[in-house]
Amino acid sequence: MMTLSEHRTELIPYDLAGMDHHLTADERAVRSTVRAVCEELIDPNIGDWFERGQIDDLPGLAVELGKIGLFGMHLQGYGCAGMSAVDYGLACMELEASDSGIRSLVSVQGSLAMFAIHRWGSEEHREHWLPAMAAGTAIGCFGLTEPDVGSDPSAMKTRARRDGSDWVLDGSKMWITNGSIADVAIVWAGTEDGIRGFVVPTTTAGFSANAIRHKMSLRASVTSELILEGVRLPSTAMLPDAVGLRGPLSCLNEARYGILWGALGAGRASFQAALDYAGQRTQFGRPITGFQLTQQKLVDMSIELSKGGLLALAIGRAKDEGRLHPVQVSVGKLNNVRAALDICRTARTILGANGISLEYPVIRHMNNLESVLTYEGTSEMHTLIIGQALTGQPAFQ
């Protein structure tokens, strides 16, 4: 008869609760594939890319990510991989363990631009854009946020007006990931009939995009301002099925889902760096892992990662089974990003002065997560979304 100890599995420091046990062999294989690509193509270079604020051969990297099906991987058909929500979440976790900027490239492409076309676009839109976007040979961006409009998209100032059978767009969008490298932009604008979405090829006359400089976060990600000055589009450019805020908000929920997984990757990488460093760093004649306060920090970080992983998996399974409520995504995004940011800050204290060096991943992840906490819904907005669900009382104004 086997003893209890023979049934025990080896503990994973960042997964003490055993989320890994609840994954299928295929899901683990997806995770391993993405991790291997990140270790080969991203990890050796990411510190330098972050420091310089530029990725070497970004088009080439996009094609390599497209080869393993990362763009729109949870969408069906049109060259997309058609994988599960959990598969996609695990991929986001591995990508963000390398860098939030790389995960942003993938999630904006797949969960915002491609999802908008796949869910709300015409068949012509899907056939024209999605195969190239899935392959990474065409890049998309998503224009919703404006210089003076963030959490309240209903107040957007970008306008689309009819001119004969055409639409003419005027306005600007701000903090747009992939904007100045995009081949196509999904632009949301106010019309006489409410907010509508448009598929805008970036070669269209009157469209321009300027990269935003002097960032201290997401430096390995392209962030841009979009300018639309008399951008003339045919009537077919409109997303036919997206009327009102339902369209853009559904896209944001897709992106938030990837974020709630991805943030755990950044937290995991920072925790692992702190654990490894603490085991090697000697003070007062012993490794600092032997001190109670260090152990308390490591334990707290590990427990938060374990809880966050189980939460992400529960949300992912609900999404795959068609029973996910949007509020649950807000719960995951709020909890996991906040926890990951706290983990990075705690890990930095363990590394001491080395914690601010790009020779280690911690300060890079910490800076990145300051942005992740804000985009696709601030922590305050997600708090109010959850609060309304609990009380039935909206408190947004």
What do these predicted ranges mean?
Residues 133, 148-151, 175-178, 190, ...:
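Short Gly/Pro-enriched turn/cap motifs at secondary-structure boundaries
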Residues 155, 203-232:
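Flexible, small-/acidic-enriched active-site or ligand-binding loops
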Residues 136-144:
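A short, Trp-centered hydrophobic/proline-enriched beta-strand micro-motif
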Residues 104-124, 150-153:
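N-terminal glycine-rich flavin-associated loop
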Residues 1-98, 108, 120-125, 132, ...:
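Alpha-helical interface subdomain recognition
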Residues 83, 152-154, 178-182, 219-221, ...:
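Short glycine/proline-enriched turns and hinge-like loops at secondary-structure junctions
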Residues 224-250:
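A short, charged helix-loop
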